[in-house]
Each structure stands twice: as C-alpha cells, then as structure tokens.
C-alpha cells in the first residue's frame, strides 16, 4: 500500500503571526526580528548610518516603498509639500441659557380677549348726502368735436440702382472720318433683359483656356471589388437558390420575401446553419455580378463570428461565396446533318449556280438538234447571247456521278436495278510544249549550278550502284 503524503499547508504571514504570538511569547525566532527591524541587515544599516547620512533614501529591509517620504529622484532635492490654509473665521459667541428661562425663542405677546354680547357701535352723522332734483326733460348733448391738430408730412428719397429707369435721351447725329453714326433712343420698356453673354468653351477655341471649371488629370476608374485576394476564403456554391434565397443556407426559417440588393444580418447564437459552409455567418453583404474566366458570376461576401471576446467583440474570417450562373460564350454543339434528298424525291434541284454572262462579243451559233451525249463525257454545250443566262457548272467529274447538259444537276440515287458497269481503262497522256511565245526563260538559271551531295559508298557494291 502506497502511503499518501499529506499536503503542506502554507504558514501565515509574519505580520499575522506577530499579532498573536507576541503576547503569548510563542513566536518563531525569525518573526520578531523581521517585524521589529532587528535583523542583521538592519543592524548593518544602522552601523553604517553612524558615519554617513542615509536618510530619505528608503534603504532598509522593509517593503521597499521608499520610507515615509518616498524616493527622491537623482539630480534634485525633494520639494516640500505646501498646504493652503484659508483665513481664520471669527469665533461664534455662545450665549448661555439659564435653567429658569422658559425657552430660547421669544414668546408671542398675549392678544386682547373678545367678549361675547358686546353692543354694536352707534354711528351718528351730522350732514348726509345732498340730493338735487330738476324738472327739465331736455336731453343732454355733448359736443365732442376734436380740436384741429397739426399734420407733418415727411418725404425721403432713396436711390436704388436696380430700380432706376434709364434717362430719356434725344437721338443725336454726329460725323467722324466721313462716317455717319446715328444713335437710338434708350427710353421705353422692354419685356426682356439684355445681358452680355460670353462664350466659355467652343470647338474653335485655341485651347489656352480650360473647358471645365476643374479639369481632372488622367482617367479616373471605379475600383473593382477585390474578391480574390488572400484576405477572403473562396467557397463555391452550386445550389442556384443562393441567388434568390440566401438565408436558407444559414437558418431553417423560410421568409416570404428577401431583398436582393441589401445586406442580411443574422444572430450567431440563435441558429445552426443547415449548410456547413455557412457556419457561424452573421452577415451576408449585398451581391455583385462579375465576369470570371468566361462566365457570369454571382458573389456575396460573408462575415463569420468564430470567436467572441469578453468585451463582446466578435472575430471571424471573411468568406467569398460565388455561384457561376452561365457561360458568356455559347458552347459549340454537334448537330447531326440529315440527308436533303431521299430515294423518293427527284424534283428538288441541287447545286444550282446562277451567274451573269460575260459582256463579250456575241457569237451566233446555228440552231442544233438535241444530240445524244455519252454518259461519261465531260463536254458541256452552252449558247451565249447578250442577255444573262443560267449557266450550270459541274462540281465533280468522277466516274460515279454522271454529267448532264441542262439547267440543274441532280444527285444520283442508287438503285438495285442498275447493272454494274466497270469503268473503262484510262490512259494518261501528257503534252509538253517546248517553244512558246507567252513566256521566256531567264538566262541566269543556266549559270546557277546546283550543289550536289557527294555520296560516300559504304560497300563496294553500293559504289558500283551509285556510279
């Protein structure tokens, strides 16, 4: 059995032990010298203080607070503390109150006593009011005509240049240097205001004056959003609902209406994201449409709240969510071609080429009867006139496609009833013209000697064959 060692309990501080053990005399030997300042270090400082002055430096074995007066910075003495003492107030004289006095506050004097049943005062006057009577019934008319007063009229002339009418000038005539100038009257009223105009900018200006009030140097371009920097985490969203309902990737609620061009905010503690790529998202910023590598891309920036400090600040990464809508350029699709003529159709013309006749001199040919043309003949007869005609040009002269003289060319339709006719043997004839008048040979060609490669025979038989 392994013995369990008891944990060591920490001893109380020297100050607490000194308070309890000093009176009982049970203090450890190191407590009393430390509290009373009688250790060896304290004694050394006391002995050294007999020869030098160490006051105010705070050198001791205490707590290191600099003593009672604190530390004094080097290079200057301590500044004595100044206490402002106001003027002395006069002393308040206290009047002693004897035990026989009723109260400190002076009492109110007694009022007269009103007795009930006292007689009313009797007023006796000598002369009363004088009443005057009259028998005249004429109404009294008062003359209230006001006295004539004095009227003072004051006039003041104020000159305002905005409302001064132009003076009336009589037309005058004058003569100078043989030319007669006639002035017109400036009097009268006008329904418009004549203001001298000045041309600020025109196409015929010399260019010395600026056209705009504040010319902008260079070209100012709107900075594009830097969505593909290292500060953003790139996440591709394949679900097309990210365009119309982005909140369904973060919360389980499905609102009836979501704004498309606003920033969406969410609470970090009130939901669990259905999509793990949208975990801890607290904000989805307004969308942006960009073109990236030949596609139209729908982008939104998201802010995550992964950590939260005690002060309430949320820290998280910024994520760039994007969804590729469609490619800008249409992809090439392979289209299967269908035959234009089947075995049942023979009337549809193919390879019909229309051209205008060359305005060359007209040649007249005698009328000929229809001539039977061999099947594999490549001769084509046509008539030429001054009017444009329909000229048919064959596209091939192989053995499998017959050539007919007519307005149209029809594609051959194979049939099982046709017998197989083998092609006749052909002989290739070559004709070389030695002399001609439409070209000449350059004499320098005969002076140029072609450099021949010297053959080195490897064997005796090869040398005989080479020579």
UniProtKB/Swiss-Prot annotation:
The keyword Repeat does not apply. A motif (Nuclear localization signal) lies at residues 1-12, 447-456. One of its GO terms (cellular component) is viral capsid. GO terms for biological process: microtubule-dependent intracellular transport of viral material towards nucleus; symbiont entry into host cell; viral penetration into host nucleus. It is found in: Virion; Host nucleus; Host early endosome; Host Golgi apparatus. Disulfide bonds join 21-27. GO terms for molecular function: DNA binding; structural molecule activity. Highly phosphorylated. Coiled coil: none annotated. It comes from the Viruses. The keyword Metal-binding does not apply. Interacts with major capsid protein L1. Interacts with E2; this interaction inhibits E2 transcriptional activity but not the DNA replication function E2. Interacts with host GADD45GIP1. Interacts with host HSPA8; this interaction is required for L2 nuclear translocation. Interacts with host importins KPNB2 and KPNB3. Forms a complex with importin alpha2-beta1 heterodimers via interaction with the importin alpha2 adapter. Interacts with host DYNLT1; this interaction is essential for virus intracellular transport during entry. Belongs to the papillomaviridae L2 protein family. Minor protein of the capsid that localizes along the inner surface of the virion, within the central cavities beneath the L1 pentamers. Plays a role in capsid stabilization through interaction with the major capsid protein L1. Once the virion enters the host cell, L2 escorts the genomic DNA into the nucleus by promoting escape from the endosomal compartments and traffic through the host Golgi network. This is Minor capsid protein L2. It comes from Human papillomavirus 69. The gene is L2.
């Amino acid at each position: 059995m392994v013995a369990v060692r008891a944990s060591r309990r920490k001893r109380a501080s020297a100050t607490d032990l000194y308070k309890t053990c000093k009176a009982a005399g049970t203090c450890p030997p190191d407590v009393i010298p430390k509290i009373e300042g009688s250790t060896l270090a304290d004694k050394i400082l006391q002995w050294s203080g007999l020869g030098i002055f160490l006051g105010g430096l705070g050198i001791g074995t205490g707590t290191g607070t600099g003593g009672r007066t604190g530390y004094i910075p080097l290079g200057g003495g301590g500044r004595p503390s100044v206490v402002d003492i106001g003027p002395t107030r006069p002393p308040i004289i206290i009047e002693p109150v004897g035990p026989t006095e009723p109260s400190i506050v002076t009492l109110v004097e007694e009022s007269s006593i009103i007795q009930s049943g006292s007689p009313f005062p009797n007023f006796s006057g000598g002369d009363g009011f004088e009443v005057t009577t009259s028998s005249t019934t004429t109404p009294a008319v008062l003359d209230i005509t006001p006295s004539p007063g004095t009227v003072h009229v004051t006039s003041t002339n104020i000159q305002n240049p905005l409302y001064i009418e132009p003076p009336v000038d009589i037309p005058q005539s004058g003569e100078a240097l043989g030319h007669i100038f006639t002035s017109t009257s400036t009097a009268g009223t006008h329904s418009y205001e004549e203001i001298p105009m000045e041309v600020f900018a025109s196409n015929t200006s010399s260019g010395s004056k600026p056209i705009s009030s504040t010319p902008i140097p260079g070209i100012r371009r709107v900075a594009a959003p830097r969505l593909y920097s290292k500060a953003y985490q790139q996440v591709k969203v394949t679900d097309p609902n990210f365009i119309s309902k982005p909140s369904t990737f973060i919360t389980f609620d499905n609102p009836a209406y979501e704004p498309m061009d606003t920033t969406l905010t969410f609470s970090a503690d009130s939901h669990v994201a259905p999509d793990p790529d949208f975990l801890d998202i607290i904000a989805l910023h307004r969308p942006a449409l960009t073109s990236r590598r030949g596609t139209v891309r729908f982008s939104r920036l998201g802010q995550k709240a992964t950590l939260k400090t005690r002060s309430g600040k949320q820290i998280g990464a910024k994520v760039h969510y994007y969804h590729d809508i469609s490619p800008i350029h249409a992809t090439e699709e392979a289209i299967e071609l269908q035959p234009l003529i089947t075995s049942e159709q023979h009337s549809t013309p193919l390879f019909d080429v229309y051209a205008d006749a060359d305005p060359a001199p007209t040649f007249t040919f005698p009328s000929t009867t229809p001539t039977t043309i061999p099947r594999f003949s490549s001769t084509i007869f046509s008539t030429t006139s001054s009017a444009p005609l329909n000229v048919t040009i064959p596209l091939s002269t192989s053995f499998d496609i017959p050539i007919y003289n007519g307005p149209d060319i029809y594609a051959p339709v194979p049939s099982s009833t046709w017998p197989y006719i083998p092609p006749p043997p052909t002989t290739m004839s070559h004709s070389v013209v030695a002399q001609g008048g439409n070209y000449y040979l350059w004499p320098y060609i005969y002076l140029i000697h072609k450099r021949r490669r010297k053959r080195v025979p490897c064997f005796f038989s090869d040398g005989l064959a080479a020579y």
